[in-house]
């Protein structure tokens, strides 16, 4: 089951989400848009288990990394209407 992982440009390049991910879905890549000159990237979304630890680890006011669970997972968790 794949989930969608979206990285927003509010990322400050702190690496907290990368370190929190238990399945190494995330990695840092060079980016000139922030002070740290790097941004999180999600090249291996097929390995995402939907735990959302990356979201919990993100220190920005607007979460810079979001995990959107696949519809099958949403239904099985009782979150769908």
Swiss-Prot record:
[4Fe-4S] cluster 1 binds at residues 11, 14, 17, 58. Residues 2-31, 39-68 form the 4Fe-4S ferredoxin-type domain. GO terms for cellular component: chloroplast thylakoid membrane; photosystem I. The eukaryotic PSI reaction center is composed of at least 11 subunits. InterPro entries: 4Fe4S_Fe-S-bd (IPR017896), 4Fe4S_Fe_S_CS (IPR017900), PSI_iron-sulfur_center (IPR050157), PSI_PsaC (IPR017491). [4Fe-4S] cluster 2 binds at residues 21, 48, 51, 54. GO terms for biological process: photosynthetic electron transport in photosystem I. Keywords: 4Fe-4S, Chloroplast, Electron transport, Iron, Iron-sulfur, Membrane, Metal-binding, Oxidoreductase, Photosynthesis, Photosystem I, Plastid, Repeat, Thylakoid, Transport. Signal peptide: none annotated. It is a peripheral membrane protein. It is an enzyme of class 1 (oxidoreductase). The lineage of its organism: Eukaryota, Viridiplantae, Chlorophyta, Ulvophyceae, Oltmannsiellopsidales. Its cofactor is [4Fe-4S] cluster. Pfam families: Fer4_7 (PF12838). GO terms for molecular function: 4 iron, 4 sulfur cluster binding; electron transfer activity; metal ion binding; oxidoreductase activity. It comes from the Eukaryota. Its EC number is 1.97.1.12. Binds 2 [4Fe-4S] clusters. Cluster 2 is most probably the spectroscopically characterized electron acceptor FA and cluster 1 is most probably FB. It comes from Oltmannsiellopsis viridis. Its main location: plastid. It catalyses: reduced [plastocyanin] + hnu + oxidized [2Fe-2S]-[ferredoxin] = oxidized [plastocyanin] + reduced [2Fe-2S]-[ferredoxin]. This is Photosystem I iron-sulfur center. It is found in: Plastid, Chloroplast thylakoid membrane. Apoprotein for the two 4Fe-4S centers FA and FB of photosystem I (PSI); essential for photochemical activity. FB is the terminal electron acceptor of PSI, donating electrons to ferredoxin. The C-terminus interacts with PsaA/B/D and helps assemble the protein into the PSI complex. Required for binding of PsaD and PsaE to PSI. PSI is a plastocyanin/cytochrome c6-ferredoxin oxidoreductase, converting photonic excitation into a charge separation, which transfers an electron from the donor P700 chlorophyll pair to the spectroscopically characterized acceptors A0, A1, FX, FA and FB in turn.
């Amino acid at each position: 089951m794949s989930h969608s992982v979206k990285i927003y440009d509010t990322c400050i390049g702190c690496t907290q989400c990368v370190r929190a991910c238990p399945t190494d879905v995330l990695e840092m890549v060079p980016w000139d848009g922030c002070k740290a000159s790097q941004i999180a990237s999600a090249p291996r979304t097929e390995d995402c288990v939907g735990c959302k630890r990356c979201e919990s680890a993100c220190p920005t006011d607007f979460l810079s990394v979001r995990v959107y669970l696949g519809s099958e997972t949403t239904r099985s968790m009782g979150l769908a209407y």
